[in-house]
């Protein structure tokens, strides 16, 4: 994310404005209400939730990803996350999905049904160390899963 993008985004957790870094480390258990305002300028979400080991559930249904090109390691190490619905993600510009869910060992179901992967050049290790996730529990739009595990 460049400086211009940072100026156009705002993140609030439990209505408290927080600075944008790699977002926020959800290491403490509890319920968080997260509100994003990125004004459609977000181009990278890589490492956004990386290391959020206590994150169990997140609703990203209104998260605008139309200009995102890099989603690598976005949920890296989110070991408590169990289900994730990313069917609202708009991904035609994404080129990098490397390690997106790496280490999400509790993840059991994943909806990627609207993922457009036509421009993706790197999907390596996308589901690496997702020991609870089975291929049949990943909803995709007919793209083939091979080197992602």
PLM features: residue spans?
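Negatively charged
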Residues: 1-149
């Amino acid at each position: 994310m460049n400086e211009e993008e940072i100026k156009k985004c705002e993140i609030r957790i439990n209505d408290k404005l927080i600075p944008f870094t790699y977002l926020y480390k959800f290491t403490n258990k509890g319920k968080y209400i997260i509100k994003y305002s990125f004004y459609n300028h977000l181009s990278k979400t890589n490492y956004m939730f990386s290391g959020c080991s206590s994150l169990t559930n997140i609703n990203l249904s209104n998260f605008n990803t139309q200009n995102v090109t890099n989603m690598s390691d976005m949920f890296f190490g989110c070991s408590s996350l169990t289900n994730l619905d990313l069917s609202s993600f708009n991904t035609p510009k994404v080129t990098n999905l490397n390690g997106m869910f790496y280490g999400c060992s509790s993840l059991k179901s994943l909806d990627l049904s609207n993922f457009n992967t036509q421009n993706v050049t790197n999907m390596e290790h996308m589901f690496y160390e997702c020991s609870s996730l089975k291929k049949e529990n990943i909803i995709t739009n007919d793209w083939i899963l091979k080197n992602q595990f």
